[in-house]
């Protein structure tokens, strides 16, 4: 979207035979929406037409409310009714991924997209990059941006000197997830469906919120797996029996309403993986964006917005590179300066978000180093400005800073910076 809006020539290579979305619920915090406004102003009204927030005018600025997994769900606790976190300038909105994807891809000319292209090899040369696909075809480009997800092929090329950082790292937990009609969810949870919730517990947790205009209910039922570890190498999901799934929540201390939700989920373990360490988001002419760069745990609902920030900064850098008269090998120093600037601006922020999301995961399972199982310590950590740096950051400043750093690097190498 960003490249097209800026008039930069591009081709999008997609592994699948058509656009498809993995997962259900997705949303953008204020930083994500402001970034998308800078990428494509026409997106916002289309997005707002399909998204939904919490139910009730007085709950629109609540990000999540904290509850418990245990019997009673925490409604008898002194903190109940005061366990939400958010911000007066934050408005919670979520949508169904498939509907959102349909909107986003409507801004991408279909003639720029090639489907059924599974990337098998990347060859970097002084004058460009050659891509090889499984179907035997090759393609040439000046810059490759890998947005190929958590199991990225492009990541292996960028991090060839850091082989231990290529594969995603298991975070010691997995979840079962489902989307059900709101009527079914209401029968189980009643008005607890009105506002997005995170349920905390010893080794078990849950995340719930409304999507699809309020017609559907999206949820994750989470399991700590830090002792056993993930068994399937190269896979992030595992299909098991219904009985095995139910046994994960058989502890009688768990509220039965969560078990009722679990009966409606498919018996598939979705492993929580992330890229906890990444030495660089680029190498020479190849860059990483989105999950290929900084796949995160979902507990801050911030991964998608970080991908948008990547896209805005990188497309702005490439727009500057495109102004250069040099081509082929002569363009390489400008590309490297641009991608280095992109990395230096985006990586610290994206990695901080990733680390904070992992910390929230530890809170959910009562494993936080300082808060433990004490909700009177957990909730203040979430309520007292934790997300301000993330939500109210001006990504246009990042664009300016990245271009400034690119100019500085180029000026060291010669007078070409005068053309930027």
Curated annotation (Swiss-Prot):
Membrane-crossing residue ranges in chain numbering: none
Record-listed FAD binding positions: 14, 27, 97, 291, 304
Keywords for this protein: FAD, Flavoprotein, Monooxygenase, Oxidoreductase
Active site annotation, chain numbering: 177, 209
Keyword set includes Translocase: no
Cross-referenced SUPFAM superfamilies: FAD/NAD(P)-binding domain (SSF51905)
Co-factor requirement: FAD
Induction summary: Expression is induced in response to 2-benzoxasolinone (BOA) exposure.
Enzyme class: oxidoreductase
Alphabetized GO MF terms: FAD binding; monooxygenase activity
Pfam family, one: FAD_binding_3
Outcome of gene disruption: Does not affect tolerance to 2-benzoxazolinone (BOA).
GO biological process per UniProt: secondary metabolite biosynthetic process
Keyword Oxidoreductase: yes
Annotated PANTHER family: FAD-BINDING DOMAIN-CONTAINING PROTEIN-RELATED, HYDROXYLASE, PUTATIVE (AFU_ORTHOLOGUE AFUA_3G01460)-RELATED
Miscellaneous field: Fusarium verticillioides possesses 2 unlinked loci, FDB1 and FDB2, necessary for detoxification of antimicrobial compounds produced by maize, including 2-benzoxazolinone (BOA). The FDB2 cluster arose as a duplication of the FDB1 cluster with rearrangement and expansion by incorporating additional genes.
Family: Belongs to the paxM FAD-dependent monooxygenase family.
Protein's job: FAD-dependent monooxygenase; part of the Fusarium detoxification of benzoxazolinone cluster 2 (FDB2) involved in the degradation of benzoxazolinones produced by the host plant. Maize, wheat, and rye produce the 2 benzoxazinone phytoanticipins 2,4-dihy-droxy-7-methoxy-1,4-benzoxazin-3-one (DIMBOA) and 2,4-dihydroxy-1,4-benzoxazin-3-one (DIBOA) that, due to their inherent instability once released, spontaneously degrade to the more stable corresponding benzoxazolinones, 6-methoxy-2-benzoxazolinone (MBOA) and 2-benzoxazolinone (BOA), respectively.
Protein name as annotated: FAD-dependent monooxygenase FVEG_12630
């Amino acid at each position: 979207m960003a490249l097209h809006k800026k008039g930069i020539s591009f081709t999008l290579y997609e592994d699948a035979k058509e656009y498809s979305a993995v997962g259900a619920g997705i949303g953008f915090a204020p930083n994500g929406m402001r970034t998308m406004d800078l990428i494509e102003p026409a997106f916002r009204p289309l997005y707002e037409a399909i998204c939904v927030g919490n139910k009730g005018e007085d709950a629109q600025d609540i990000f999540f409310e904290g509850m418990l997994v245990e019997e009673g769900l925490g409604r008898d606790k002194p903190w109940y009714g005061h366990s939400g976190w958010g911000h007066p300038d934050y408005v919670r909105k979520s949508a169904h991924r498939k509907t959102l994807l349909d909107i986003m891809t409507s801004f991408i000319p279909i003639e720029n997209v090639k489907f059924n292209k599974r990337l098998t090899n990347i060859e970097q040369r002084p004058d460009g990059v050659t891509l090889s696909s499984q179907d035997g075809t090759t393609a040439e480009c000046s810059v490759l941006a890998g947005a190929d997800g958590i199991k990225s092929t492009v990541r292996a090329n960028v991090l060839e000197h850091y082989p231990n950082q290529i594969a995603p790292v298991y975070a010691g937990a997995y979840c079962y997830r489902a989307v059900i009609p709101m009527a079914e969810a209401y029968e189980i949870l009643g008005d607890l469906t009105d506002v997005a919730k995170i349920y905390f517990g010893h080794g078990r947790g849950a995340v719930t919120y409304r999507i699809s205009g309020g017609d559907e209910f999206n949820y994750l039922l989470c399991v700590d797996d830090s002792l056993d570890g993930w068994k399937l190498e190269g896979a992030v999901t595992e299909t098991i029996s219904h009985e095995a799934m139910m046994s994960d929540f058989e502890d009688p201390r768990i509220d039965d309403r969560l078990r009722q939700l679990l009966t409606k989920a498919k018996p598939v373990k979705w492993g929580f993986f992330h890229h906890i360490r990444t030495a660089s988001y680029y190498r020479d002419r190849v860059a990483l964006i989105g999950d290929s760069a900084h796949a995160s745990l979902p507990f801050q609902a911030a991964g998608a917005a970080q991908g948008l920030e990547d896209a805005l900064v990188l497309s702005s850098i490439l727009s500057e590179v495109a102004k250069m008269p040099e081509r082929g090998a002569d363009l390489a120093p400008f590309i490297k300066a641009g991608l280095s600037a992109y990395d230096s601006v985006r990586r610290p922020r994206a990695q901080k978000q990733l680390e904070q999301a992992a910390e929230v995961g530890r809170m959910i399972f009562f494993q936080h180093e300082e808060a433990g199982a004490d909700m009177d310590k957990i909730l203040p950590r979430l309520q007292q400005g934790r997300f301000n740096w993330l939500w109210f950051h001006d990504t246009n400043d990042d664009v300016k800073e990245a271009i400034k750093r690119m100019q500085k690097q180029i000026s060291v190498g010669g007078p070409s910076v005068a053309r930027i």
